[in-house]
Amino acid sequence: MVAEVKDGRIEFLSGNPNAPGMKTSLCARGVAGKALVEDDERLQQPLIRNGERGEGKWRAVSWEEALDYTAEKLKASIDQYGARSIALSDRGGPFRDFHRAFLRGLGSPNYCNHDSSCARNVHHANQSLTGLGRKDVAYDFKSARHVVLQLRNVFESIAVQEVNDLTDALDNGCKLTVIDIRASISATKADRFFLIRPGADYAFNLAVIHELLEKDLYDKAYADRYIQDLDALKAFAAQYTPAWAEAETGISASRITRFVEALAQDMPSVIWHPGWMTARYTNSFYICRSIYIINALLGSFGAKGGLPHVSKVGDVGRKDLKTFQELFPKPEEKRADGAGWLYPHFEQGPGLAHLLYKAMETQAPYPVKSYIAFRHDPLMGYPDPDHLKQIFDNLDLLVSITFTWCDTAWYADVVLPLSPYLERESLLGTKNALQPFFFIRRRALEPRFDTRAEWEIFSGLARRLGLDALAYDSIEDIWNFQLEGTGVNIEDFSETGLVNLSDKPRYPDRDNLKFNTPSGKIEIISKKLEDQGLPSLKPYESPARPQEGQFRLTFGRCAKHTQGHTVNNRALYELMDENVLWINDKEAEKLGIEDGDTVTVGRNGHTEKIKARVTEFIHPDGVFVVHGFGHTLPVESRAYGRGLADNRFMQGSLDKWDPAGGAMALQESFVTVKKG
């Protein structure tokens, strides 16, 4: 992003034209950065709770007092329960190294990101098949001939480069297929749209695999070279015909067959996107895995216009940024969430936050008593917030580090206000890509209020807890530490904000692909899964259908908001001030509901009101809302009481998760809808 500033105020914001695919574009959230900075309702100074949790009574304090208080509480937790009693979660991203180093320096293994409520299934699915993480392959949209979006809504859940690259591809003749329970904005741009029954995606994908194999439409030469256990896949898929899938999905066998034939014509430059937010159903892991299998059968892995392996910094003969985590030994303690030991098929790195919360509740395998939520709002992002509050009541310390009010901050003991991104600088970042690069974020403005950057907050805590290696006074010293040995200096970022590490994009040699599996191939049968008693190829089980008068509650994103973080932003509020309930027109007619009517949604005694959007373009089994609304904090005058919060209808869902992929199953709740 480029910010034009005059007299201490933002004049104009645009995308960085030097960043790949940006073309100076910004999404609505990016443009609304000016409104965020100018918002008087955002957090303005550190706060310490002065009443019961969630009561909204606060004592405004100095940074010295806030950091002293937090450090004393953390030290007390370490003294009584050990360093493993401290946990920290975030929303991921490229700037995590410093606060992860802080946690490691204390001696705790309990770092989690939000991914068990987002993309953990797709990550583990790729690992189980290719040994690669979800970010180890690129989506080469710009060169693709056919793109399939099933668990991804590119044109509403926006990454600007993806939108621009896919738009360019469509302009150049690329075909787009969308599979969804509703007609999203992405569906309006599609050549083919399949309106699928909620939860039946796996059936559709198995039928595609069946057709590719049964009719020899797959890339045989590629499969012979790179795919292991193909015979097992053929035997498994034999029963899952398009005719069988028609009864499960509501999509005709003939349409499935024609679609598969079209895919085969465009291989290997095909991208069947494996998904982004895949914490939806109890079989979402296998939906994601089946997508990766289809990509493998089409030869898309490693292909231009498909899923080429990204280049990491070392792959292009350069040295990566030095990390602060390397300053401290890896904690020997087992993770509280069980990732890597109780569940050896799960990657340890970002953990599984819902299982961390279970450990807070049960005190097993040991007590977790202090929790820092950094740019993370689990009370909005995870199901059943009332249950989660009961779990948080077991904590001795709950700290929220956030740039704006959120439910978790409102329930916290300490709130440490983070400067908005235009008012803070961050660590240098690395982008692994076809052409990898380093990038920098500098502050465009000095903070309006008494807020701080993340490095300032964690440096302050580190200094108080004896972690002198993290006690920095300037961001320049941090940047210089990171750049040691890279051959790059700070001045190299001045003109463009990034430093390319290779002279051009580098595609892998498709004749010499390497996969990070024991065999070096794509393994249909995963030993890690099988050793845990989990099938690599899971037989299909028909998803539950709603009872009479019920609907499966589904949710997603829109282009105007980022989860619940932006709903109180004045500029974005003016674009979209509340969510609405999508409901099928024929189902609405049965209930006497017309478009725009206020309806009551209910489940297990909990009800909320919302306006109905009556449309033929949603499957009759489901209803849909945009996630992030239904705010109840009086400090948010615009967001307060607007729309419905989907996660409050997911009572009991903290215990609903996919044992193969590790992520939550957030679309396994059924609700009633009535007029009024």
Label each region the model flagged:
Residues A444, R448, R452-S502, A571-L581, ...:
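Long, contiguous, secondary-structure-rich segments that constitute the structural scaffold
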Residues M1-K215, Q239, S252, E589, ...:
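N-terminal export/assembly segments and adjacent metallocofactor-ligating motifs
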Residues I185, C406-R441:
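Flexible glycine/proline-rich, aromatic-decorated loop/lid segments
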Residues H99-D168, N172-I179, Y202-L206, Y292-W410, ...:
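Extended redox/cofactor-interaction regions of prokaryotic respiratory oxidoreductases
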Residues S85-P94, E248-I251, G275-T282, V313-D315, ...:
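Conserved short loop/turn motifs at secondary-structure junctions
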Residues I48-E65, K215-A253, I372, R443-N516, ...:
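N-terminal leader/propeptide and maturation segments of large enzyme subunits in energy/redox metabolism
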Residues E52, Q150, K189-A190, Q239-W244, ...:
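Flexible glycine/proline-enriched surface loops and loop-helix/loop-strand junctions
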Residues Y81-S85, Y218-A223, S269-I271, G302-H309, ...:
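Flexible, glycine/charged-enriched surface loops at secondary-structure junctions
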